[in-house]
Regions:
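Basic/polar N-terminal segments that are highly enriched at the extreme N-terminus
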Residues: 1-14
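Generic secondary-structure signature for well-ordered alpha-helical cores
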Residues: 3, 24-31, 58, 62, ...
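Acidic/His- and Gly-rich active-site-bordering loop/insert found
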Residues: 13-99
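Alpha-helical metal-binding/catalytic segments enriched in His/Glu/Asp
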Residues: 26, 88, 98-137, 222-228, ...
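Short alpha-helical patches at coil-to-helix transitions and adjacent helical residues
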Residues: 50, 85, 103-111, 145-148
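Short coil/turn connectors at secondary-structure junctions
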Residues: 60, 81-86, 123-128, 189-192, ...
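Midchain, well-structured core segments that form catalytic/ion-binding scaffolds
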Residues: 135-136, 140-242
C-alpha cells in the first residue's frame, strides 16, 4: 500500500458512475411517485437505508460504531491510528417530500472517497471516518439536527430521547425498535477535522457556471412555542378596539 506522499494527488479521481449508482440505489428506499424520497428518521425505511449504507461501508473494509443517539461512524484505518480521524458525512433521513441528494450525497461521497483510496492502494496518515447523523431534518421529531446536536453537547441525550412524534412514539423507543441505539456515549469520539459535502439547494453556482463553492456561513434557526390569547373574528371587518 502506498502513502499519499508517493502519488500525484491531482490525478486521483473518484468513480463517478459508482457514486451515482449508490445514490440511485439508496433513493429507491422511500421513493415517491414524483421522483423524490420520503424516508423519515427512525422509520422502517430509515433502518433499510442505514443497513444499506453500513453494508457498503463494510464491503469497503470499514469498521462501524453506533452511539446512543444512533449516529453512525464508519472508519477506515490510517497509518497512525492514534491520530484523531479526518471525518466527513451528513445525514440520510429526508423531509416528507425530500430529494435524492440532500444529505445522502455527503454520506455516499465519503464512502466513495474510501472506495477510491482502496482501489489505488493509498494509505492515509490519519484514519478517515464517514458519519451519518440521526434526525438532521427534524421532520418527525424536534429539534432539528438532533444527532449532531447531542454529539456537540448542544442539548442532552435525555432531552432527545424524550422527543415524540405526532403518534406519541419517542426517539428512544424508535431507536430501540429499529436496532440503532448504540453503546458509545455521544461526543466521546475525537475528530481531527470535519468536512461536509452538500448540494447547494439553490441556483447560484449553476447561474455563475461554477462547479463547487465553499460555505462561509449558514442560516441560523430558532424555534418558538407561542400561545395567542384572544377571540376569533374575521380579519377584515373586525376593529381591533372592539
Amino acid at each position: 500500500m502506498t502513502t499519499t506522499a508517493a502519488i500525484d494527488i491531482d490525478k486521483v479521481r473518484i468513480n463517478g458512475d459508482r457514486l451515482w449508482a449508490s445514490l440511485m440505489e439508496l433513493a429507491q428506499i422511500g421513493a415517491t411517485p414524483k421522483g423524490g424520497v420520503c424516508r423519515l428518521t427512525l422509520t422502517d425505511l430509515d433502518k433499510q437505508g442505514r443497513d444499506l449504507v453500513l453494508g457498503w461501508a463494510k464491503e469497503a473494509g470499514m469498521t462501524i460504531t453506533i452511539d446512543k443517539i444512533g449516529n453512525g461512524f464508519m472508519r477506515r484505518a490510517g497509518r497512525n491510528n492514534s491520530l484523531p480521524p479526518i471525518m466527513t458525512g451528513s445525514h440520510i433521513d429526508t423531509q416528507p417530500t425530500g430529494g435524492k441528494f440532500d444529505g445522502n450525497y455527503g454520506v455516499l461521497a465519503g464512502i466513495e472517497v474510501v472506495r477510491t483510496l482502496n482501489d489505488l492502494g493509498i494509505e492515509t496518515e490519519a484514519p478517515i471516518e464517514v458519519a451519518f447523523w440521526t434526525n438532521e431534518e427534524g421532520s418527525r421529531f424536534v429539534p432539528v439536527m438532533m444527532g449532531s446536536g447531542v454529539f456537540a453537547k448542544a442539548f442532552t441525550l435525555e432531552h432527545a430521547y424524550a422527543a415524540t412524534d405526532t403518534e406519541g412514539k419517542s426517539v428512544k423507543d424508535e431507536l430501540e425498535r429499529i436496532g440503532y441505539i448504540g453503546t458509545q456515549e455521544p461526543g466521546d469520539h475525537p475528530i481531527g477535522a470535519y468536512f461536509e459535502t452538500h448540494i447547494e439547494q439553490g441556483p447560484v453556482l449553476e447561474d455563475n457556471d461554477v462547479t463547487i463553492g465553499v460555505v462561509s456561513g449558514v442560516l441560523g434557526i430558532r424555534w418558538f412555542d407561542c400561545t395567542v390569547t384572544g377571540m376569533e373574528a374575521h380579519a377584515g371587518p373586525t376593529p381591533m378596539a372592539l
